[in-house]
Each structure stands twice: as structure tokens, then as C-alpha cells.
Amino acid sequence: MLNIFSLIGLNSALYSSSCFFAKLPEAYAFLSPIVDFMPVIPLLFFLLAFVWQAAVSFR
């Protein structure tokens, strides 16, 4: 079965040492949690559109 978490990049937080994901340079290592979350941000905008339409009663 296809794992949905692998599609949206959440497993990068769990398997950040995997060879599939590149490591950040040392100067940017503190940004690693943000970079791991970045693939999910477009989905949040997609969900925000539904919340917005629910707030205006799907006019």
C-alpha cells in the first residue's frame, strides 16, 4: 500500500539521514526542522481554501 506520508515529505523528519535527502551545510543546520516541514506548506494552503469556503458557506 502506498504510504501517503512519503508523498508529502513528512518522512524526511523521521529519516533525515537517508541518502535520498541531501544534508544541509553546517551553517544552515539550525534550519533543518523548517526545511523538513517546507514540503507540507502547499497542502496547508489547500486546506485553508476549504476552511475559508466553509466560513463563507461555500458561496
From Swiss-Prot:
Residues forming the propeptide are: 1-22
How is the protein disposed in the membrane?
Single-pass membrane protein
From the record, give the transmembrane residue ranges: 30-50
Top-level taxon of the source organism: Eukaryota
Q: Which SUPFAM superfamilies match?
A: Photosystem II reaction center protein K, PsbK
Q: Tell me which GO cellular component terms the UniProt record holds.
A: chloroplast thylakoid membrane; photosystem II reaction center
What GO biological process, any one, is recorded here? photosynthesis
Q: Where in the cell is it found?
A: Plastid, Chloroplast thylakoid membrane
Q: Which UniProt keywords apply?
A: Chloroplast, Membrane, Photosynthesis, Photosystem II, Plastid, Reaction center, Thylakoid, Transmembrane, Transmembrane helix
Q: Which InterPro entries match?
A: PSII_PsbK, PSII_PsbK_sf
* HAMAP family xref list: PSII_PsbK (MF_00441)
Quaternary structure and interacting proteins, as annotated? PSII is composed of 1 copy each of membrane proteins PsbA, PsbB, PsbC, PsbD, PsbE, PsbF, PsbH, PsbI, PsbJ, PsbK, PsbL, PsbM, PsbT, PsbX, PsbY, PsbZ, Psb30/Ycf12, at least 3 peripheral proteins of the oxygen-evolving complex and a large number of cofactors. It forms dimeric complexes.
What family is this protein classified in? Belongs to the PsbK family.
Query: What exactly does this protein do?
Result: One of the components of the core complex of photosystem II (PSII). PSII is a light-driven water:plastoquinone oxidoreductase that uses light energy to abstract electrons from H(2)O, generating O(2) and a proton gradient subsequently used for ATP formation. It consists of a core antenna complex that captures photons, and an electron transfer chain that converts photonic excitation into a charge separation.
Annotated protein name in UniProt: Photosystem II reaction center protein K
Q: Origin organism of this chain?
A: Silene latifolia
